[in-house]
């Protein structure tokens, strides 16, 4: 089940725009059915896969941020198949930052989710310390 909305895609694009401005790269937003959100392009060539997670709170609201295990697996599979690194791009109300998919593997896993989606709303997630997500 795809739970991504038009609002989600707009928020992801805004996060990618900030990333592009900071690093002088291009981020191509991939189709919603693709396993990750975007591909970073450097000097006209693919350089990395990006999964975007937009939060509606400030970065200091919680000590950790969730990275879905299946998203990290997809990023690592793409990295293994292509050689392009996979990364998570987190955006909060007050800041944004990135962390590599490889680094996420070192953190504890919990089961977390949204009760408003019923049983389909829960999944295993890595508990990534917010302080480890760097600009």
Task: List each model region and its residues.
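Acidic-basic catalytic patches of nuclease active cores, encompassing PD-(D/E)XK
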Residues: 1-32
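A structural signal for short, well-ordered beta-strand segments and their strand-loop junctions
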Residues: 29, 49, 86-90
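Short acidic/glycine-enriched loop/turn segments that link adjacent beta-strands
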Residues: 32-36, 94-95
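Conserved catalytic cores of phosphodiester-cleaving nucleases, focusing on short active-site segments
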Residues: 38-58
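Mg2+/Mn2+-dependent nuclease catalytic core
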Residues: 55-74, 78
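Nucleic-acid nuclease catalytic cores
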Residues: 76-104
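Intrinsically disordered, low-complexity terminal regions enriched in charged/polar residues
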Residues: 97-135
């Amino acid at each position: 089940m795809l739970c991504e909305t038009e609002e989600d895609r707009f928020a992801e694009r805004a996060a990618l725009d900030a990333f592009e401005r900071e690093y002088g790269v291009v981020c191509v937003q991939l189709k919603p059915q693709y396993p990750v959100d975007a591909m970073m392009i450097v000097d006209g060539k693919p350089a990395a896969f990006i999964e975007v997670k937009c939060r509606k709170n400030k970065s200091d609201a919680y000590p950790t941020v969730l990275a879905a295990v299946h998203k990290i697996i997809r990023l690592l599979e793409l990295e293994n198949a292509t050689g392009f690194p996979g990364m998570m791009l987190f955006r909060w109300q007050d800041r944004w930052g990135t962390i590599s998919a490889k680094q996420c593997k070192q953190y504890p896993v919990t089961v977390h989710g949204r009760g408003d989606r019923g049983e389909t709303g829960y999944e295993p997630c890595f508990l990534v310390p917010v302080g480890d997500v760097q600009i």
